[in-house]
Amino acid sequence: MAQQAADKYLYVDKNFINNPLAQADWAAKKLVWVPSDKSGFEPASLKEEVGEEAIVELVENGKKVKVNKDDIQKMNPPKFSKVEDMAELTCLNEASVLHNLKERYYSGLIYTYSGLFCVVINPYKNLPIYSEEIVEMYKGKKRHEMPPHIYAITDTAYRSMMQDREDQSILCTGESGAGKTENTKKVIQYLAYVASSHKSKKDQGELERQLLQANPILEAFGNAKTVKNDNSSRFGKFIRINFDVNGYIVGANIETYLLEKSRAIRQAKEERTFHIFYYLLSGAGEHLKTDLLLEPYNKYRFLSNGHVTIPGQQDKDMFQETMEAMRIMGIPEEEQMGLLRVISGVLQLGNIVFKKERNTDQASMPDNTAAQKVSHLLGINVTDFTRGILTPRIKVGRDYVQKAQTKEQADFAIEALAKATYERMFRWLVLRINKALDKTKRQGASFIGILDIAGFEIFDLNSFEQLCINYTNEKLQQLFNHTMFILEQEEYQREGIEWNFIDFGLDLQPCIDLIEKPAGPPGILALLDEECWFPKATDKSFVEKVMQEQGTHPKFQKPKQLKDKADFCIIHYAGKVDYKADEWLMKNMDPLNDNIATLLHQSSDKFVSELWKDVDRIIGLDQVAGMSETALPGAFKTRKGMFRTVGQLYKEQLAKLMATLRNTNPNFVRCIIPNHEKKAGKLDPHLVLDQLRCNGVLEGIRICRQGFPNRVVFQEFRQRYEILTPNSIPKGFMDGKQACVLMIKALELDSNLYRIGQSKVFFRAGVLAHLEEERDLKITDVIIGFQACCRGYLARKAFAKRQQQLTAMKVLQRNCAAYLKLRNWQWWRLFTKVKPLLQVSRQEEEMMAKEEELVKVREKQLAAENRLTEMETLQSQLMAEKLQLQEQLQAETELCAEAEELRARLTAKKQELEEICHDLEARVEEEEERCQHLQAEKKKMQQNIQELEEQLEEEESARQKLQLEKVTTEAKLKKLEEEQIILEDQNCKLAKEKKLLEDRIAEFTTNLTEEEEKSKSLAKLKNKHEAMITDLEERLRREEKQRQELEKTRRKLEGDSTDLSDQIAELQAQIAELKMQLAKKEEELQAALARVEEEAAQKNMALKKIRELESQISELQEDLESERASRNKAEKQKRDLGEELEALKTELEDTLDSTAAQQELRSKREQEVNILKKTLEEEAKTHEAQIQEMRQKHSQAVEELAEQLEQTKRVKANLEKAKQTLENERGELANEVKVLLQGKGDSEHKRKKVEAQLQELQVKFNEGERVRTELADKVTKLQVELDNVTGLLSQSDSKSSKLTKDFSALESQLQDTQELLQEENRQKLSLSTKLKQVEDEKNSFREQLEEEEEAKHNLEKQIATLHAQVADMKKKMEDSVGCLETAEEVKRKLQKDLEGLSQRHEEKVAAYDKLEKTKTRLQQELDDLLVDLDHQRQSACNLEKKQKKFDQLLAEEKTISAKYAEERDRAEAEAREKETKALSLARALEEAMEQKAELERLNKQFRTEMEDLMSSKDDVGKSVHELEKSKRALEQQVEEMKTQLEELEDELQATEDAKLRLEVNLQAMKAQFERDLQGRDEQSEEKKKQLVRQVREMEAELEDERKQRSMAVAARKKLEMDLKDLEAHIDSANKNRDEAIKQLRKLQAQMKDCMRELDDTRASREEILAQAKENEKKLKSMEAEMIQLQEELAAAERAKRQAQQERDELADEIANSSGKGALALEEKRRLEARIAQLEEELEEEQGNTELINDRLKKANLQIDQINTDLNLERSHAQKNENARQQLERQNKELKVKLQEMEGTVKSKYKASITALEAKIAQLEEQLDNETKERQAACKQVRRTEKKLKDVLLQVDDERRNAEQYKDQADKASTRLKQLKRQLEEAEEEAQRANASRRKLQRELEDATETADAMNREVSSLKNKLRRGDLPFVVPRRMARKGAGDGSDEEVDGKADGAEAKPAE
């Protein structure tokens, strides 16, 4: 059942894959993948293709959708569903990979191969696929033999390590929560099982057990619950498992990286600290809790979220498991307790609370209970500990100074100490584990490294730890990319293989450089180290430096979140991560209070002192010097060159790790997280897709498919696979490469499957696996042969032995026969009687000699024993000496090791100091060099400036020359253009367009004058805007002045408020003191309650006023804060307005260059400016009103505070007076008490001794009563005070809520106004951006005309000078407004043209993007098809060769086709005849196929018979020789049958091929007869006749073959009958044997059951006896208790009588002393109360006695019941003993029966074996005859096949040639048509291009002509202005003159150029 459950999660359901309905559905619907927002991709059927889009119907809902063709991805056939290796997919794309992973995940298949690596998806539940049975399944198996699993990856790594002697590494990578740690555990589990030196897997070795237990310990101390993962590794580890030459584990070593120690002191919401804290608090017993001073969860400050549980995990059980793991690891109990004490100490450190002293910033510790607990746990002095934290000694120069710490510094020191302690403990634990795992002395030959490091993390708040973790993951991903993509391809190129380098674009080096680059520009870690060197450096300065240095880096961004949440953003491979740089400098430096560190080093606890043994390497407070008074611990000054930062150490550690990984052969396991909710069975497709893209899964599969992932060195290839090609390599020396080439030729591998390099042979994926299978088969054959030889040798030896035995038996028989003859002979009898008598005398002598020898031997034995004892004593002495020496040696080695460690530390320290010195010297030199370099640069710059000035002058002169040259070149250009125009005028269509353009140019010339008027109006607008800007600037200045005044008043108020707060604090302290005094007085004096109540009322009033003062102060503070906020907002507004003003200026300058459409925008802007002015004025008014209100509030608050101060002073005076009166009253009451006490003393002397005792009791009772009443009074008073306080609080709360509402309303109003302003600003900015975009487009078009504008520069200057004159003249030209409108229309047309062009441009860009996408998609498809292309190339070459022949034939056939149309019918008739013959041949083939099937079935039967015969081998083993003989004969038979079967299969295959060929040929012949019936009648007839003959021959041969086969079938049937008889005999023998074995097993089972019952009875008897003993003990204890209770009862009764007597006496005394006065009355009351109490006690005693009696009764009942049970158990034990004796008897009888059965079975077997041997001999003879007959038949069949093949091949070739020729002709014609179309399109495009070019040229010419006309017009205007007579119709006339020349763009450019000058 367990195996079936496991198979469900390992193997794919084959029925699902081979479903024909799904295959048909896929083929019919044309299913594809379409993008989906919900599920990533969804299936759809392709319905129609329309251009670049396609219409698809969604499978899920049947909805039809239009999708871009580029977004559609191909779907794989259903047979590839849930494929185990994604490299096998035919269509490799994102959708297919995601679908495959999703299908497998939903089926419970979490492992999937992806080319060379494995993809794992976290199932979030336990699967039954990690048991020992599964490990055994995967052990030693090849990858392709088993389904994907982590065990398969581990096994391949282990096998390749053993085979290649190369170190391996298994890298589990992925995000946090993807399952890396769990897979690492499974890897270790597999290796511990497979590579264990102990072969009995149930009892594993100690080392393997320790290796498995290392993980739980490290997880307990280093793992924690996070948001993403319940068991997240908060440290990285690299587990190195060492193996010896034989592959056994000899040791292990664990390296850890970057423990997140800050988690020990604080955790995020819903997260836990390290597991061990919770394990300890839940699992510790009461005794342990008291020893470790443990408290509940909520009492610890360091457990931020209290007791957070993990679902499905019990912390209590986990604690026990962890402690058990430590025991297995060999950690002694002392060290375990030391660990637990440190953990408790860390928790207690969090409970130390510091407070700020009243008048100073110094910290104090009001309650030192937590400090006492810490010092007790860590073995240090409390006073030294508190002094070290509050006033540590710091080295200043040469002296030591005690410096008082602030509260913040003390808190920081405690947290740093807690973190350091936990980290050191963790490091010690890792070293201890390594010591346990490395204790073996065997040398490791190679190792497997397993990397489990924290996954990629993106939290809400990411800090320094997350940066280090993500940096590590970047490096690992880069290693993966480098090994998979770059190194792979580089090796191909090195080895000289034909390979085109593919760039997959997965280089992560830029991101790594951003983090780790040391210089040019420095990375983040380098900048962090640099900031740690600088004094007064803060986290803020570090962030600024990062922004400055890396701001332009492509992988670096400014965060989009608020500054509170993030400081900068890095684009990692897994996504963007926002980092918050809080306390990064401190985390990087990791400073510590060295006073406490030395204290811990000197601890009385050995464990703690060992943890802190390297105190000299700590960054202490003397190194972190000069803390500023106001700054927090983030602003320390560090002394240079005194430490190495955390970042540096981690970087070095990581570099070492990467170096070791590069030296190994990496095996990648890519872990994927399916969802963030930790739900089983849920998969988020987009999340998985992102991870697949980041991990480079698709690229990895692609390179695995395209490349050659398997490679073998030449020597190794030859050595390993030479067995497959035994005779291919000649004898003698041969080069490895040549040998490999010969071997590959012999193996007949396809050339596409391999490549031969310079030193290796490269194979495609799967080829080596195939070779390995063939090698295994070959080796099995060789071994079978070897076994046969061995068995033959053994059989021969056994035969020779039998022969010797036979001869010996003959000798014995001969001797026995002789004795039988002699025994009755009388002389022989006499001889036998006399001979012993002769030997008697000799025997006596021999006995004497023997006795003497015996004495000597005994003496020798005694001497030897003495020697032996001496030797043993000597040995024991030597052993003791040896042990002493060993101990001494161990001590010496330990001392040596410690000395070595010290030496290493000193040398390391020395090296560090030397490095620091060198660094400092180098820096000094660098600084000097920089200074020199800067000075030199300064000089160079000055020289450069001079040179540049000279160059500028030269360039100006050169520019003038160039302008002259330009004019000449333009003239030449004009000539060339004129020639072009003459050539192009031939086209009639273009002439019409030219006329239209000329008309437009005429219109433009008329509109030019109107444009000039517009420019003038724009200039006016500019002046207006400038005036407005100046006004706004003046207002801003006023605002700033007002703000400054407000700042001054605010500072004054802040100062007043601080003074008031100090006074209030003093008053509060005084009130607290008064409270204490009042409490004391209340305890001493009950009479003064009324006065105290009055004082309490006054106190409440004072408290009320104080609270009011506090609320007022808080209100003032809130007002101040709001004032600050408003000031900041005003400053922001000021900045925004300034930016807007600048934008407006730029816009005004730009508007002078714009057209009429932009005038509308200007008018809008003017309106917006007016609105802005209004809003600004309103805001200024509101702001002034607010400031006035604030001032009034402040003045009122100050007055109120002053009044309250006076009131508090008055209250204080009253309280002091009340205090004095109370003290007086106390004195008076004390006197009265003294008098009363004297009276009481007199009365006490008179009373008896009993009364004295009673009085003492009563005094005690009264004191208790008094205390109770006083407490009750106090409680009532406090309750009253509480009620008053709550009332006051509620009043103040209501007031504060009202104020907050008002304040929030005001704030909301302000925010609304600000939002309105911001929206307006946004709109303006958007408009300005749009304007700029339009202008940019305009400028891009103008760039074509820049050359002409430069030429006209001089003319424009002249125009600019005349603009002033022209402006005056234009006032008179207001009548020509109509022209403006026409110009505007023209401009609109131009804008439309521009928009059209821009749209075209955008369309082209979009089309380009689409083409790019299609290009990439096609590239991918092309890569996939390249493999198929190699196969197709050969056929293409053949087709090209035949193309030429076909062209010739085609020409001939066209001429003759008409002639042979008549003869078509005749050919068709002949074809029909041939078809009938072909059908008959097909029938014959079917019959042959049936015969083949029958033969196969027979073969299977023979195989089963063989197996049965093999299984029927005798268990006893006597007739092995005969059975082996029969087996060999049967094997020979089977081999012969196999050969015959293979021959028959070959024949059948040939016939099938012939059939197929005939069918194809017939169809080809039909087509051929239709096309080419050209003079080939005779040839066809002859061929036909030949074919008929051949068919007849074939038919005859087929008939012969059928006869022979029928004969063979008959013979086979005979054989089958014989075999069946044999089988029947064997079955009967087997049945007999099975029955005997079954009986034996039954008997054995019965015996076992009996033994079990016997054991059970014994155990139960022992248990009963133990219970009886326990019951007897309980009885005795109960009896003792009963006696004790009886004694107590008697004592209670005595006490009761005494109490009753006392009561009577007291009653009498009370009756006598009733008239004594007030004192007596009081005493009476007391006595009565005492009596009542005594009565209550009596009642209680009675109740107790009753309970005791009940218990006694119950105990007696229990005793009786126990006695009865005891008797029953004794009788039961007796019965069991009798049953046991009976079972032993039965057992003996069964054994006797068993021996008898075995004898009978052996005799039966011998008889059956002899019969079988005889039958086997007969069968062998029959088989020999049959084989001979079949060989003859096979020869005949082969001859006929050869003839048939030759004929069919001839026919086939002719048909194929004809078809190929026709296809090639069709293709050629289609190609020609396509080429023609392309030519036509190209010609059209050329014509369009020429037309556009002509248009532009014409426009250029028109522009130049209009410019000339404008110049002329300007000159004429000047002349007329001088004269003073200028008519109004000049512009229109000019327009008419300018008709026929100029263009749209030129006029626009001209106008722009004209208008640009005034804007300057």
Swiss-Prot record:
Domain (Myosin motor): residue spans on this chain: 81-776
Keyword Ribosomal protein appears in the UniProt entry: no
Biased composition (Basic and acidic residues): 1035-1055, 1122-1137, 1948-1960
N6-succinyllysine: modified positions: 850, 1669
Annotated localization: Cytoplasm, Cytoskeleton; Cytoplasm, Cell cortex; Cytoplasmic vesicle, Secretory vesicle, Cortical granule; Cell membrane
Cellular compartments per GO CC: actin cytoskeleton; actomyosin; actomyosin contractile ring; adherens junction; brush border; cell leading edge; cell surface; cleavage furrow
PTM entry text: ISGylated.
GO MF: actin binding; actin filament binding; ADP binding; ATP binding; cadherin binding; calmodulin binding; cytoskeletal motor activity; identical protein binding
Modified positions (Phosphoserine) in chain numbering: 628, 1114, 1714, 1943
Phenotype for residue 810 to N: In a breast cancer sample; somatic mutation
Expression by tissue: In the kidney, expressed in the glomeruli. Also expressed in leukocytes.
Residue ranges annotated for the Myosin N-terminal SH3-like domain, each copy included: 27-77
GO BP field: actin cytoskeleton organization; actin filament-based movement; actomyosin structure organization; angiogenesis; blood vessel endothelial cell migration; cortical granule exocytosis; cytokinetic process; endodermal cell differentiation
Binding sites annotated in the UniProt record for ATP: 174-181
Coiled coil segments of this chain: 837-1926
Stretches the record annotates as Actin-binding: 654-676
SUPFAM superfamilies: Myosin rod fragments (SSF90257), P-loop containing nucleoside triphosphate hydrolases (SSF52540), Regulator of G-protein signaling, RGS (SSF48097)
Keyword Phosphoprotein: yes
InterPro entries, per the entry: IQ_motif_EF-hand-BS, Kinesin_motor_dom_sf, Myosin_head_motor_dom-like, Myosin_N, Myosin_S1_N, Myosin_tail, P-loop_NTPase, RGS_sf
Record PANTHER family: MYOSIN HEAVY CHAIN, NON-MUSCLE, MYOSIN-9
Disease implication from the record: Macrothrombocytopenia and granulocyte inclusions with or without nephritis or sensorineural hearing loss: An autosomal dominant disorder characterized by thrombocytopenia, giant platelets and Dohle body-like inclusions in peripheral blood leukocytes with variable ultrastructural appearance. Some affected individuals lack leukocyte inclusion bodies on classic staining of peripheral blood smears. Alport syndrome-like features of nephritis, hearing loss, and eye abnormalities are present in some patients. Deafness, autosomal dominant, 17: A form of deafness characterized by progressive high frequency hearing impairment and cochleosaccular degeneration.
Domain comment (free text): The rodlike tail sequence is highly repetitive, showing cycles of a 28-residue repeat pattern composed of 4 heptapeptides, characteristic for alpha-helical coiled coils.
Protein name per its UniProtKB record: Myosin-9
Organism: Homo sapiens (Human)
